[in-house]
């Protein structure tokens, strides 16, 4: 029976996220991740077929973290929910600047299959606006779009 891998896929994804935090997205490569884990690049490429696959795993991790911030904010009871979403978005940018850039400011050309960080939370945002202002879904979507663009 072959030995169990000492470095798990989750560890590699977390190390890749740390590399991005420290060096930005341009610093993400197999050697940097391996150095972070104190190993060769072999575990990276045995768990991920390409660096793009590893990047996608980091995007998924960052999306989950962002979604948890939006939905589990400690400010939820102090402010209207829609305001909390904006506050958490800004807080995320301040606390995780390189992850924020990687998640929201990356080149998305040819990346049609990836979900945006907001795709999971958007229905809740629109519903919150509809309920708070007693407006139609279309009006809530337009308000959100205009707030997003101009604020």
Ranges and model annotations:
Residues 1-7:
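N-terminal intrinsically disordered/low-complexity leader segments
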Residues 11, 15, 19-53, 57:
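Helix-turn-helix
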Residues 20, 53-62, 70, 103, ...:
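Alpha-helical DNA-contacting segments of helix-turn-helix folds
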Residues 56, 60-84, 121-131:
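Amphipathic alpha-helical linker/stalk segments
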Residues 71-98, 143-147:
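Hydrophobic alpha-helical connector segments
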Residues 92-112:
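Amphipathic alpha-helical segments used for helix-helix packing
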Residues 110-134, 141-146:
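Amphipathic alpha-helical packing segments from all-alpha helical-bundle domains
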């Amino acid at each position: 029976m072959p030995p169990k891998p000492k470095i798990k896929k989750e560890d590699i994804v977390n190390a890749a996220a740390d590399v991005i935090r420290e060096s930005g997205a341009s610093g993400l490569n197999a050697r940097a991740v391996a150095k972070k884990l104190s190993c060769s690049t072999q575990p990276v490429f045995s768990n991920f077929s390409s660096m793009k696959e590893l990047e996608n795993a980091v995007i998924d991790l960052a999306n989950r973290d962002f979604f948890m911030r939006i939905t589990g904010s400690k400010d939820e009871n102090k402010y209207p929910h829609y305001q909390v979403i904006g506050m958490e978005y800004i807080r995320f940018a301040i606390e995780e600047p390189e992850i924020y850039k990687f998640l929201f400011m990356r080149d998305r050309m040819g990346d049609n299959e990836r979900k945006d960080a907001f795709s999971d939370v958007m229905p809740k945002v629109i519903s919150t606006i509809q309920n708070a202002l007693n407006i139609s879904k279309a009006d809530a979507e337009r308000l959100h779009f205009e707030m997003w663009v101009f604020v």
